[in-house]
């Protein structure tokens, strides 16, 4: 067989290593480096939309507002306005603009800054007569533009007719021969709102002299002008709305533009108050169309800034209050509100809102920032312009107007008009700066489906129409940009790459929509013409990288060949492979590609070309079989001196049979074609005889030199023997495909009756496993595969028990190295479907092979729990072997074992034999719990344990269980007592005794051990339980002496023991006197033992003082006939021989201290008694006062007359009587039987009812209880 070729770095090699250090063949999955790459970048997707609006516009805005808006400054206007006091408000139209002045006149200019007309606020032609000299607040124009109305800060309103012939007489004739500026007087003056702030002024309908006016008082009125008498124009008014409430104030009103519908013209009035926003229909009659409550956060704050704005077509109205905006959408057909949206709170207060067009809303904030919002997209900010640089007059909302998508600004120095520039202006600005890439990115942003600024930039809102406008300029600009980059000294890779990526994104999305725009592959080919030979490398590198990331899938044949030629000369095989795999092969130069693949041994790529170009999926398999069977001379594809790796055929077959294109790892499409290829290849691989090859010839594809030696299923056996691990890994992966389901209609016929299914392949493998001609390695791997496949696909694979015996015997009898883990996995997966007829022999085989995990499952299934437990105990690393801990396994075994059975006895023997081992591996606490649940008799095994500390810990845990004493041997209890006395500290012993119930015998046993250990405090506890209080007193006194001798001078500990001794003395009954004598005598003699300046002597002194006080207190609780008990005890103490032998001086000082303490205690007692007596006197008086207040009543009815005397249903006149008492006022006397008599027994009656029954005052008795008491009369 020929040698394999060199493994080039560029080849998509497949990792075929299967060994013990890596994956087993059951875990292996075929893959290629290319398939991994495709998985990480599967397909190109368009970049997400920029959240701040189109990227190009956002970039322009970042450079300043001048980038998006062009400004014109009109400076001559202000020189004219100076004579009239300066501007106060503005109203622009298409050909003229009107400016209100601070002296009251309204000036009309054209856009050449010529003053056209002066509107004078007077009804007379003489300007000196009754002219309003007040700043103009607002200006409005009627629908046909013939009449103008203005409101003033004084509350006056004037209307001018621009079509009248007469003018106001000038005060002086011009001397320079120039024509004087015409001046018009007002035709109507409304003074109903004088000294009131006007909050709304609009023309109503198509009328010339009808106005809707609102003011701060809350009134909204309609004024109608009409002529009377000598054609004099007068007006009348009608109130439309009056908001006059302390809780709700009118902020402003705004009339919509004229709405014409079905021969009817009308307006909608929007009204904003501090609590509501409403829409009112004014004709044919006034009616409320919509109302909503202003948000609570706004209601609860002071309204500083507010605004209302209507769109020109009346489809939307927006209003703002402080820093929140709301937009109401209205149906043009029936005026019904369609939706209402509310913005989140803005960071700063909003001065003014005005619609730029029907969709975009302009917002001016308090910091002079102008925002363009899109309310339909959650009030997204599309543009942000800084108007602070323009130095607007204050307040800016009065000097700023948006009309016909233009800005009109009154600044401190001039009048400015701003207009949005067109998209071509912005593009040209980029080009002039040499920023071609920025220009292309700007156009790309305008081609996005979501481009709300398109209309402002003079583009069509419709995406298709906008594409037609932009694609041709974009294409031409792209070519120019590419040419511009190339003309530089060195073509920059990054710039070319960025440019081409923009072109790729745009042309892929938009060029298909327009036949007039060349496709992307044409552009890329044209781009190649711009590069000189020295710069080709940069262009090819950019194109190759764009192809590699999946952005481009097709290029022209010319470019394809050029780029392949270039990288072939560079011998960059990796790029060649990526290009051929990633691009559409229809434009590929097949001859060139095949030659390169054969020259550089790009075997995977050669297979791909053969599949895609020739649509032939069988020839690669045939060639690979020729190579494996040493028939290289017959190869068509791999006919060179080098051969592909031997594992290539397994990866190729795996990909195809699982429906994936090799080596792309992408699904073969369409599905019908994929199914056909899979059927043909599966029929080929699993054919039972040699097939004809070529298929239209009479020649056959033999794997043996001698056709007579050709085996059945030749290709199956060839692949199995060539590399059994990879072949079985291939089968393991392809078995997961639905192709091999028995009920799949797409499976291929073999012969005419058999189908290539999992069952079919398993039958072939069973024959191969039984074939002794195969090596032991092949047979055991096949057996392992069969075992695992049966457990994975039980519904598709059926195998007889005899065949399973053969599988199991093959695995167990194998001597192949390195398959221990996988063999055990195979046997374990087979157990649910296999039952050995000779279980004992099977167990012996498993033991011989150390298949412990399998053996454990066998023991469980056979209920051999003793053997399972022994096996667990023999295993060193249980967690690694069984994937669980020993506690869980042991607990499981003991719970599953039937109580009282023979197996239960065997398990007990195993536990008894390995008791020490179980304690060390499971833990003492867990063992106690598990053994208690299984059998209490197991606890006796602790007696055989040599380590006493282990015994003590075990028994501690055991006897902490409630009611355990009656369930275990008494020897355990005795041992527990002995070990506790031996190993527990004195403090631990005391804690244990306090929490343990002991019998008398156990107490005596413990007492002996405690006395041996001189644990007097614990001994006192035992004596107290035995009611030997005199001995308990001795123990406590010995403990006190022991503490003093050992230097433990904690007074609180000593006093605690002494007080326990007091309690024992008092509990001693008849021995009480002797106990007290013993206690005091002991302390006196102990006092005499210590030197004068010893600390212990002082402690004894304190203890003696406490002892005498305890004795005195004990007297107070004794019987009355034992009044002399104290002196008897003291006499006996002083007569005691040990006291007599003490020094008189020591005894004198001691007794003086005792009596001083006694006197002090007596004085304290007297003071406390006095305090208690004084306090108790107050308490008694308070108690008596409470008693005199009366008693509660059990029932609400009088027991005699049955009427209500308390609670619900009481006569109402009683409340009047109560009021009379409270107010001390005279009242008409009414007999209400109000006095009530309440007895101590809680029964109540009317006083008159008792007297009617012959009871006398002060001698009342309860009629129910027949008892006399001092009743309470209320």
Swiss-Prot record:
Which cellular components does GO assign to this protein?
Answer: CORVET complex; early endosome membrane; Golgi stack; HOPS complex; late endosome; membrane
Q: Where are the zinc fingers (RING-type)?
A: 1198-1266
Name positions with the PTM N-acetylmethionine. 1
GO molecular-function term, one example from the UniProt record: GTPase binding
Listed A to Z, the keywords are: Acetylation, Golgi apparatus, Metal-binding, Protein transport, Repeat, Transport, WD repeat, Zinc, Zinc-finger
- Give the family this protein belongs to, as stated in its UniProt record: Belongs to the VPS8 family.
Which ranges does the UniProt record give for the WD repeats? 75-119, 131-170, 193-233
This protein's major location comes to Golgi
Q: Which Gene3D superfamilies match?
A: YVTN repeat-like/Quinoprotein amine dehydrogenase, Zinc/RING finger domain, C3HC4 (zinc finger)
CHCR repeats located where?
507-665, 915-1092
Recorded hits in Pfam families, A to Z, give: Beta-prop_VPS8, TPR_Vps8, TPR_VPS8_2, zf_RING_Vps8_fungal
Q: Which gene encodes it?
A: VPS8
Read off the SUPFAM superfamilies from this record.
RING/U-box, WD40 repeat-like
Task: From the Swiss-Prot or TrEMBL record, state where the protein is found.
Answer: Golgi apparatus, Golgi stack
InterPro entries documented for this protein:
Clathrin_H-chain/VPS_repeat, Vps41/Vps8, Vps8_central_dom, WD40/YVTN_repeat-like_dom_sf, WD40_repeat_dom_sf, Znf_RING, Znf_RING/FYVE/PHD
Record's function text: Required for localization and recycling of the CPY sorting receptor (VPS10) to the late-Golgi compartment. Involved in the retention of proteins to the late-Golgi. Plays an integral role in the complex vacuolar protein sorting process.
**Entry protein name:** Vacuolar protein sorting-associated protein 8
Any keyword Protein transport?
A: yes
